């Protein structure tokens, strides 16, 4: 019996992982092609080149030799583990990455001591984070009782969302949030429905240990999710409210204790960081009517399917527990997005940044998946009353917008196909119907990703040749600095040099400078 159970679960895991790898390859296909053929680096020309890759190289060089956490080369000298805790220094996934790189360096496959190695690692790690995101999200929707078809569609909508690319491209360490959120919710649900608390403890401990800012974001959304599940019970819950209260709080305390090193390091780094807002910068209350902030077309930070609108307006489906939950979350995020103060709150009450869009990506994806799952409970008239106005507005936007977004057309096609399925009860041809829906959803996401790439990724891309330019990593300057370092070996010796572009030149050229950029 146990052997049969293990075999079935292990088999399912490998199948899900295999599908996740395929979806990830599709998701990153254009970026893989651009990197191999054109040498286009999957990292932002700003923070990616100036911070992400130099920080990774610096951390690897110090962690591989188990050097002291205080190092003279970190600015004017400092605790690099604490100083880079906002980025990668406390990420267990990055530690595993460093271990693999060390093995490769030992056997002579890799040369991570030069900045030219790290663009390849940047792309590979982004894909690994995406694979983990797909796998964890599938298991989350499974425990939320999504049917297999709805699970697949919702997982594709989230895993192939623009946020996955945008986060991994711009601030790659933020890619960890994309799987930590569903993992934390999965942990809660496993306890509520199966009385198993282990995954929740691990997920919260990982979050607290990895990044204090992650803990801040996650505390808001997981806290709200937990309160909702505590107040409103679900039919498959097997623990009482009292048990939910006592056990989850106890598990959270255990998570805090097990992550105390990372949490203390992150909190102390946060407290020592001057986050005081520039008094000359005024944060407007209302969000500007700008394409950057659009949700359903041409969005810079995120673009989601117009199916979300129809799902939100289908109030009859709010009788389903998780449909109502994800609809409420989506409504709150939409309403909150109208104010820049909402963006500021998710960035430590400093300059407004849309760091919360990954939550919207998950809630809207779950909502769309559940809408398709419960579609057959609606009648045709009810569906059309909500769909036709959305389609008309979408068509008008396509015609009047200078970008003529193709993603809206694909979204309209999806709504029409759903109408045909509802009208003719095509769920009896389940395999064909599901295959068509999955194909259309994938096409929609690919089109959305392509549009977002042209808008939010391409303008900030650089090629491998940038790594050899005079203002980033010049061979002449490199040789000159090597000579200086040979004659000045003391830790108090400093080189006062920083290029206009490579602001973290001391990390890139391996010398003790007088500053660092973060």
Pin down the residues of each PLM region.
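Transmembrane alpha-helical segments
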Residues: 133-141, 180-192, 220-228, 310-311, ...
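Membrane-embedded helix bundles of polyisoprenyl
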Residues: 125-143, 149-192, 196-232, 244-267, ...
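Contiguous transmembrane helix-bundle modules in multi-pass membrane proteins
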Residues: 214, 328-334, 347-470
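Soluble catalytic regions of membrane-associated enzymes that act on cell-envelope
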Residues: 405, 434-518
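Membrane-interface coil-to-helix junctions
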Residues: 23-133, 156-168, 172-177, 271, ...
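Start-transfer (signal-anchor) and selected internal transmembrane alpha helices
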Residues: 1-35
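Periplasmic/ER-lumenal interhelical loops and adjacent helix-loop junctions
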Residues: 50, 54-59, 90-98, 243-358, ...
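Membrane-interface micro-motifs in multi-pass membrane enzymes
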Residues: 83-86, 119-132, 155-185, 209-218, ...
């Amino acid at each position: 019996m146990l052997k049969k159970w293990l075999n079935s679960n292990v088999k399912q895991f490998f199948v899900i992982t295999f599908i996740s790898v395929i979806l990830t390859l599709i998701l990153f296909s254009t970026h893989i092609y651009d990197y191999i053929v054109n040498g286009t680096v999957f990292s932002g020309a700003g923070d990616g080149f100036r911070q992400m890759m130099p920080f990774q190289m610096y951390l690897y060089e110090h962690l591989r030799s188990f050097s002291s956490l205080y190092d003279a080369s970190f600015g004017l000298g400092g605790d690099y583990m604490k100083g880079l805790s906002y980025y990668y220094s406390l990420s267990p996934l990055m530690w595993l990455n460093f271990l693999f790189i060390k093995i490769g360096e030992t056997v002579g496959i890799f040369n991570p001591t030069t900045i030219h190695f790290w663009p390849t690692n940047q792309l590979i790690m982004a894909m690994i984070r995406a694979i983990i995101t797909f796998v964890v999200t599938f298991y989350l929707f499974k425990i939320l009782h999504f049917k297999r078809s709805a699970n697949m569609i919702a997982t594709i909508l989230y895993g192939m969302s623009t946020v996955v690319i945008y986060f991994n491209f711009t601030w790659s360490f933020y890619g960890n949030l994309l799987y930590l959120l569903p993992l934390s919710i999965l942990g809660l649900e496993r306890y509520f429905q199966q009385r198993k608390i282990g995954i929740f403890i691990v997920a919260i401990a990982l979050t607290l240990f990895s990044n204090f800012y992650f803990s801040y974001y996650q505390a808001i959304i997981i806290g709200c999710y937990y309160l909702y599940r505590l107040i409103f019970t679900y039919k498959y819950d097997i623990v009482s409210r009292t048990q939910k209260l006592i056990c989850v709080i106890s598990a959270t305390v255990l998570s805090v204790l097990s992550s105390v090193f990372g949490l203390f390091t992150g909190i102390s780094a946060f407290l020592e960081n001057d986050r005081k807002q520039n008094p000359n910068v005024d944060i407007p209350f209302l969000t500007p009517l700008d394409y950057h902030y659009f949700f359903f077309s041409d969005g810079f930070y995120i673009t989601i399917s117009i199916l979300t609108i129809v799902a939100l307006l289908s109030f009859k489906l709010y009788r389903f527990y998780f449909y109502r939950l994800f609809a409420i979350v989506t409504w709150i995020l939409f309403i909150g997005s109208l104010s820049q103060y909402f963006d500021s709150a998710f960035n430590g009450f400093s300059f407004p940044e849309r760091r919360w869009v990954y939550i919207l990506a998950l809630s809207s994806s779950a909502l769309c998946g559940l809408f398709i799952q419960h579609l057959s409970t609606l009648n045709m008239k009810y569906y059309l009353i909500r769909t036709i106005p959305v389609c008309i507005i979408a068509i008008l936007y396509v015609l009047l917008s200078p970008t003529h977004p193709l993603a809206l057309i694909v979204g309209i096609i999806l709504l029409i196909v759903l109408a045909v399925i509802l009208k003719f009860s095509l769920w009896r041809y389940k395999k064909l119907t599901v295959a068509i829906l999955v194909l259309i959803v994938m096409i929609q996401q690919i089109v959305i990703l392509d549009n977002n790439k042209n808008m939010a990724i391409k303008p900030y891309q650089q090629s491998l040749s940038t790594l050899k330019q005079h203002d980033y990593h010049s061979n002449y300057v490199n040789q000159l600095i090597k000579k200086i370092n040979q004659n000045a070996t003391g830790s108090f010796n400093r080189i006062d040099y920083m290029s206009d572009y490579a602001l973290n030149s001391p990390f890139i050229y391996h010398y003790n400078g007088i500053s660092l950029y973060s």
